[in-house]
A protein has these predicted regions:
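Short active-site loop/helix that positions an aromatic residue
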Residues: 50-60
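Active-site and NAD+-binding cores of ADP-ribose-processing enzymes
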Residues: 1-2, 7-37, 60-181
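A short, exposed loop/beta-hairpin motif centered on an aromatic-Gly-Thr core
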Residues: 40-46
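Short, hydrophobic/amphipathic alpha-helical packing segments
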Residues: 47-50, 124
Length: 181
């Protein structure tokens, strides 16, 4: 609760009025495939720093609007950015930790941003669906999202929340936005 998240979107021209719904998760019919979700599945993709969004969005012919959101509640996140080192002396399942480390590398691998269907996304999308619907924490509660490193070197950390356009308002408030020419 209270953590700032940033989400960017490109527009053809500078918008006259901006509202929460303009910057939150895409509606199902416009949700494109992403690292964690196939086309038609809406999730809230964000980062911990505005510069991360700008780096990932890349150059555009129009303007970029970056919204600063604040988490309204505590969320349960699988953090793939700070996994412990593997050691045979540490208690736990080495196989599971090795899988998470490999998955973390895979999800942060650069993939061309175009309109093609990227089969490279299929493993990360399948794992995300498993985490979203089947995985529970020690208290039996589902996870709310995943944090992972940006595919852009040294750009920062991304957070995907498992909430669609309608559910976004339960998780975040839009506190501010900035327009980049």
């Amino acid at each position: 609760q209270g953590t700032r998240l940033y989400r960017s979107r490109s527009f053809d021209k500078k918008p006259q009025i901006l509202e929460f719904n303009d910057l939150t998760s895409a509606p199902y019919e416009y949700a494109k495939q992403n690292r964690m979700s196939p086309a038609g599945i809406s999730m809230f993709y964000s980062s911990l720093q505005a510069k991360t969004n700008l780096a990932e969005l890349g150059p555009t012919d129009g303007v970029i609007v970056t919204g600063r959101f604040t988490l309204k509640k505590d969320v349960r996140i699988l953090d793939l950015t700070s996994l412990p080192s593997l050691s045979y002396w540490v208690k736990g399942d080495i196989g599971e930790m090795e899988f998470l480390r490999d998955f973390s590398k895979e999800v942060s691998r650069p993939i061309d941003q175009d309109d093609r269907i990227h089969i490279e996304y299929l493993p990360t999308q399948a794992f995300t669906e498993y985490i979203r619907y089947r995985f529970k924490d020690d208290n039996g509660a589902p996870l709310d999202g995943i944090m992972f490193n940006s595919s852009i070197p040294n750009a920062g950390k991304n957070v995907v929340l498992f909430c669609n356009k309608e559910e976004s308002s339960e998780y975040v408030d839009l506190t501010d936005f900035k327009i980049y020419p």
